[in-house]
């Protein structure tokens, strides 16, 4: 039986956190925060094997672009103590193939978040290079 790990965090500007920087890290991407005027480059981080945006039907298609989505969140939540997002860190099952784990992750995101009108930015990291985080 695999190790069970399910952790929920709040991403908060009050803690000095940036939604754009966090999304860039999880996706292993380079993104510019227009709110803070800085670049966040995690392209050399490696280990990201899946990074995709899941939108509910009512969400604008432009939010399929990670940088657009998270910059809009930064600007819409202007309060200095704003809660910008929630992050789920979940261990994948060692007994399942990566394809099976991806299918389970997508199902969780679609059924528990997107079906309730939320946008989900899903990232899966290679277990050989670090934690399984999505």
What are the language-model segments listed below?
Residues 1-134:
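N-terminal nicking endonuclease/strand-transfer module with a His-rich metal-binding environment
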């Amino acid at each position: 039986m695999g190790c069970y790990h399910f952790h929920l965090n709040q991403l908060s500007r009050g803690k000095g956190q940036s939604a754009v920087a966090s999304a860039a890290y999880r996706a292993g991407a380079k993104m510019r925060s227009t709110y803070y005027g800085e670049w966040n480059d995690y392209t050399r981080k490696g280990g990201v094997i899946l990074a995709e945006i899941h939108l509910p039907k009512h969400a604008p298609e432009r939010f399929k672009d990670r940088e657009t989505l998270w910059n809009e969140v930064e600007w819409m939540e202007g309060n200095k103590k704003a809660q910008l997002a929630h992050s789920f860190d979940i261990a994948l099952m060692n007994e399942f193939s990566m394809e099976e784990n991806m299918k389970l992750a997508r199902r969780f995101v679609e059924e528990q978040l997107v079906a309730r009108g939320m946008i989900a930015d899903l990232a899966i990291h290679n277990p050989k290079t670090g934690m399984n985080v999505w």
